[in-house]
Amino acid sequence: MSTNLEEKQRRFSKLQKTLGVVFPAAILLSTGYTVWVFIALICVDSNIKIRNGYRNLGGGIVLIIFFFITSGLAYFSYFRVLFSSPSFCGNTLYTYYGFDNPIFLCGPNGAPRMCGTCKCWLPDRSHHSRVSMRCIRKFDHYCSFVGKDVCFSNQKFFYQFLFYGFSAACMVLISTAIMISRTYHYRSLPGTWIFVLVFSAFGVLFLGVMLVRHTGYLLLNINSHEAKNWKTRIYSFSVFFPEHMDSRVLVQSDPGDLPWDRGYSENWRAVMGDHWYNWILPLRRSPGDGEHFLYSPSFVSKMQSKALSMNS
């Protein structure tokens, strides 16, 4: 039985990894063609060049500048994710679970979490990826469109890609729609313009939904994996406060608790960094080591109260 499950898992992993090569190649080809059509045919031919006595030099140049900024940052963020190294687990020391760590995620029996497949210790917010078949720090999800596990090492770049990609798609969709309404009758539209219009509309819809979802996750300091059934999810924690206790106590959270929610501002900075230029530029990854995460003070107080009541 286990052999069949392992074989299915290997097939699933192989399929996802194949899609993780096909999708990025298709995305780069499609967006590259869209960039050429938008710049050469829409911005230059239909705005900057004189055509039927009409010329909008300023508008064409402004479109090109803003498009290069947003699309350039989108491409750069995408490549940062594409060529990032996943933050694999495996070197977590057992001292992570010592008495100097007052609270950490544990198994239902109170013991430190260990992956049954990788045979490695799992620090807080780490999970096993079914595609990479490795345990990853702050695992979010595997994204076939970038062919990578979105995790601690690239979560910031992934969010920036969604934001800049959505901004560029909006600019292309709106400006193309305006130019079509001014220049062409719908029956005489070039096929290239139709492709750009449809592709940018898909980008706005898809990236917009993803951006809204991940903005909500970011502001609550949860990820896609933790967001599954989060209103009913119960965590198990090993709790120890040396000033009040002699040994660790197993404490369970209440359904819907958000252990790492420290408010919108701190949650944002925990992923995007402390400085405004890090929010804009996809240069530095999220602060921290991917193992230690600050808990909500109110949540720690709740866990302490529960632990003391159980220990008394």
UniProtKB/Swiss-Prot annotation:
Organism expressing this protein natively: Schizosaccharomyces pombe (strain 972 / ATCC 24843) (Fission yeast)
Keywords: Acyltransferase, Lipoprotein, Membrane, Palmitate, Transferase, Transmembrane, Transmembrane helix
Membrane-protein topology: Multi-pass membrane protein
Keyword Transferase among UniProt keywords: yes
GO molecular function list: protein-cysteine S-palmitoyltransferase activity
EC id: 2.3.1.225
Subcellular location: Membrane
Gene Ontology cellular component terms for the protein in this record: cytoplasm; endoplasmic reticulum; fungal-type vacuole; fungal-type vacuole membrane; Golgi apparatus
Positions of the DHHC domain: 113-163
Enzyme kind, highest EC tier: transferase
UniProt note: domains: The DHHC domain is required for palmitoyltransferase activity.
GO BP annotations listed: protein targeting to membrane; vacuole fusion, non-autophagic
Cleaved signal peptide residues: none
Membrane spanning stretches: 22-42, 57-77, 161-181, 192-212
Protein name as annotated: Palmitoyltransferase PFA5
InterPro entries reported for this sequence: Palmitoyltrfase_DHHC (IPR001594), PFA4/ZDH16/20/ERF2-like (IPR039859)
Pfam family, one: DHHC
